[in-house]
């Protein structure tokens, strides 16, 4: 037993030698375990890593052609290259309103959701802002895309926003060229007003005005408006939709051309049994200018709610049918009539112009040359405070508080027009007022938006 301790080291050495295959690996396998793999990329580039991409482009700087050899696909190579060259431009999420960012070299592109546009999808592209950049009418499609359209006689231009003439003499356009300085009128453009929500614009149109319209005034307003006071001489062909109505004795009212066969005017201008002659293309009523066209009226249609015995100026609008169609040219051109919504929108632009051959000052002489005048829209509260007479929902006020400029006697029935992006639309009919151009008083006009459906229905050309 004394020799037993010497056997223990021998036993342990034999055990270790017998387990060598489990402890020691060959060189190749040991290298695989001991070598730390390189984490050459942990970002978006990993999705592009294939084959020898690390050797070609990570450990060394590679060219586009070398990267192309790795991917063997131009599209994938391009996507990789955009990030490889200058980093990910989309990392800061520059696209707004749900836009999708696509990286590019030193740049990026936003793919915008429907209803938005701009470099970062920051612009509302619906009709509610600047009319969707449409030059006339705008509508939002079910998928919230803008659809621009034009009034009759126009077609969409190549940009799908502008409207260009589709006929020789489209409505609302002046085609006479002037050598003198440009004539300034009340031209307006679309602003950032919320046109998409027209509730406020037409609220007074849907107010129940039946009770008001059935009230009899204690006294009539002082004047039919048959004048433009403080205006300027129009050039020949500058207001080609303007007409003058002649009775058996003298000129007495104005009107506007709707189309070749129909004129719109004020209902209070009409007297039962009167023979009316319409003169279109007129400029100077004291001279023959060879631009005039004369037509007889064969039918008068006052609005069905007009009743002069109840109120001479409520629903003050009428249509005149001509015996022969007018020949349209640069001096005889219709005024444009939009739908109800846009007629209201155009009126709310706040600046229109009126025209006629009425008196050039209160109780003064009648104008020989056609006059025109810009008149600002007056808010309803101010309008109501300015007079003791009723201002119904089918009327509006326009003019200057300081006086001196207004429509006046002889201008009744003439057009109140708003010029939009170079095309003029009918927004009112000259109706009545107290004196002419008196301080604190305004001209009162028939609100055409209330009657556009009636106008279009009655004046269809067959």
From Swiss-Prot:
Extract one GO BP annotation from the record.
blood coagulation
Q: Name one Pfam family in it.
A: Gla
Summarize what the UniProt record says about post-translational modification. Activated by factor XIa, which excises the activation peptide. The propeptide can also be removed by snake venom protease. Activated by coagulation factor VIIa-tissue factor (F7-F3) complex in calcium-dependent manner.
What would you give as a GO molecular function for this chain, any one? Answer: endopeptidase activity
Q: Which residues carry this modification: Phosphoserine?
A: 107, 198
Limits of the Gla domain: 40-86
Task: Report the residues modified as (3R)-3-hydroxyaspartate.
Answer: 103
CC terms in the record's Gene Ontology section:
extracellular space
Q: Which residues form the propeptide?
A: 22-39, 186-227
Segment forming the signal sequence: 1-21
Positions of Ca(2+) 4 binding: 54, 59
- Name the family the entry cites: Belongs to the peptidase S1 family.
The written remark on domains in the entry is: Calcium binds to the gamma-carboxyglutamic acid (Gla) residues in the Gla domain. Calcium can also bind, with stronger affinity, to another site beyond the Gla domain. Under physiological ion concentrations, Ca(2+) is displaced by Mg(2+) from some of the gammaglutamate residues in the N-terminal Gla domain. This leads to a subtle conformation change that may affect the interaction with its binding protein.
Query: What name has this protein been given in UniProt?
Result: Coagulation factor IX
Record the organism.
Rattus norvegicus
């Amino acid at each position: 037993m004394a020799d037993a301790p010497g056997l223990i080291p021998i036993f342990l050495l034999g055990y270790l030698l017998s387990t060598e295959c489990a402890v020691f690996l060959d060189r190749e396998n040991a290298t695989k375990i001991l070598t730390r793999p390189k984490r050459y990329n942990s970002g978006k580039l990993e999705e592009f890593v294939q084959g020898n991409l690390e050797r070609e482009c990570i450990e060394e700087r590679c060219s586009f052609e070398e990267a192309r050899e790795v991917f063997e696909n131009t599209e994938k190579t391009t996507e990789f290259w955009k990030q490889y060259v200058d980093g990910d431009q989309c990392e800061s999420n520059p696209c707004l309103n749900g836009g999708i960012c696509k990286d590019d070299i030193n740049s990026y592109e936003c793919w915008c959701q429907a209803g938005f546009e701009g470099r970062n999808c920051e612009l509302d592209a619906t009709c509610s802002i600047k009319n969707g950049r449409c030059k006339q009418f705008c509508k939002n499609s079910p998928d919230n895309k803008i659809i621009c359209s034009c009034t009759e006689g126009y077609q969409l231009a190549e940009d799908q926003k502008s409207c260009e003439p589709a006929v020789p003499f489209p409505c609302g356009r002046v085609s006479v060229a002037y050598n003198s300085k440009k004539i300034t009128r009340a031209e307006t453009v679309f602003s950032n007003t919320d046109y998409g929500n027209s509730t406020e614009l037409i609220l007074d149109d849907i107010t129940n005005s039946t009770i008001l319209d059935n009230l009899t005034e204690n006294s009539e307003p002082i004047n039919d408006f048959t004048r433009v006071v403080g205006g300027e001489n129009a050039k020949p062909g500058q207001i080609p939709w303007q007409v003058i109505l002649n009775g058996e004795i003298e000129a007495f009212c104005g009107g506007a051309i709707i189309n070749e066969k129909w004129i719109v005017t004020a209902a209070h201008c009409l007297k039962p049994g009167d023979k009316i002659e319409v003169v279109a293309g007129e400029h100077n009523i004291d001279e023959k200018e060879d631009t005039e066209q004369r037509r007889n009226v064969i039918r008068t249609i006052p609005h069905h709610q007009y009743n002069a015995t109840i109120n001479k100026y409520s629903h003050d609008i009428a249509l005149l049918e001509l015996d022969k169609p007018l020949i349209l040219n640069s001096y005889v051109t219709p005024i444009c009539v939009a739908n109800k919504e846009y007629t209201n929108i155009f009126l709310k632009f706040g600046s229109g112009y009126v025209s006629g051959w009425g008196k050039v000052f209160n109780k003064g002489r009648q104008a020989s040359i056609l006059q025109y005048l810009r008149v600002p829209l007056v808010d309803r509260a101010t309008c109501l405070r300015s007079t003791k007479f009723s201002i119904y929902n089918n009327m509006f006020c326009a003019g200057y508080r300081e006086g001196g400029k207004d429509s006046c006697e002889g201008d009744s029935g003439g057009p109140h027009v708003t010029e939009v992006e170079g095309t003029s639309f009918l927004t009112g009919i000259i109706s009545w007022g107290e004196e002419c151009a008196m301080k604190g008083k305004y001209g009162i006009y028939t609100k055409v938006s209330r009657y556009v459906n009636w106008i279009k229905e009655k004046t269809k050309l067959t």
